[in-house]
């Protein structure tokens, strides 16, 4: 069955992963009329199945984790790792504007990120690599903030494993250590889930 749809907008976003929705937020805040389209019956894309970590070199929060980093070092790492397969202006744009994007989202959305001091760059042998602090962990986000739209959100990977809730990267890393702290975090997650009766009834 073919459905006709005709609407004129300033900014059309195809897909509801982190890239598309971030672009939609920016366009909306800049005054554009935005339309987001998604081919699936749920939104979130492959981002909904990821840990949500963002790699931001030279960000404004580096003092919180005691690192010294720069956008130039971030560019050097990308160039050393990727080589000539990506144009220089694209790599420069990412290294130079990633923190600007982060600050914009902190100001204009409910999304929050904190740096992970022990989350090192994957390829330490490359020029410009850092031992930690560039990877940013998204903060916990309750589905209640989404209202009725929560019913259409693609569920995360943990729910497919019989776990009816999601967790942050910090929480999941702590659980893997199998020590007293990990058991306490596991208990906190379960308690948070069971006490959140409104969300469980949806």
Residues of each region from the PLM?
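A short, basic/flexible loop-to-alpha-helix module at the beginning of a structural domain
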Residues: 1-8
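Alpha-helix N-cap/helix-initiation motif
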Residues: 2, 16-17, 40
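General secondary-structure edge motif
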Residues: 7, 27, 34, 58, ...
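N-terminal Rossmann-like FAD-binding beta1-loop-alpha1 element of flavoenzymes
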Residues: 11-36
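Conserved N-terminal/central alpha/beta ligand/cofactor-binding core
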Residues: 39-202
């Amino acid at each position: 069955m073919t459905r006709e749809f005709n609407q004129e907008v300033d900014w059309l976003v195809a897909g509801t992963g982190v890239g598309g929705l971030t672009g939609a937020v920016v366009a909306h805040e800049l005054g554009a009329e935005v339309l987001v389209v998604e081919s699936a019956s749920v939104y979130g894309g492959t981002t909904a199945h990821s840990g949500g970590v963002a790699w931001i070199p030279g960000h404004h929060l580096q003092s919180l984790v005691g690192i010294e980093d720069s956008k130039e070092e971030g560019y050097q790492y990308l160039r050393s790792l990727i080589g000539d397969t990506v144009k220089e202006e694209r790599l420069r744009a990412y290294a130079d504007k990633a923190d600007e994007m982060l600050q914009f989202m902190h100001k204009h959305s409910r999304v929050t990120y904190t740096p992970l001091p022990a989350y090192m760059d994957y390829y330490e042998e490359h020029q410009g690599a850092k031992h930690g602090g560039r990877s940013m962990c998204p903060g916990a986000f309750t589905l209640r903030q989404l209202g009725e739209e929560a019913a259409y959100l693609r569920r995360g990977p943990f729910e497919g494993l019989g776990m009816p809730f999601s967790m942050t990267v910090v929480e999941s890393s702590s659980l893997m250590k199998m020590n007293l702290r990990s058991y306490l975090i596991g208990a906190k997650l379960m308690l948070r889930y069971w006490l959140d009766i409104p969300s469980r009834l949806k």
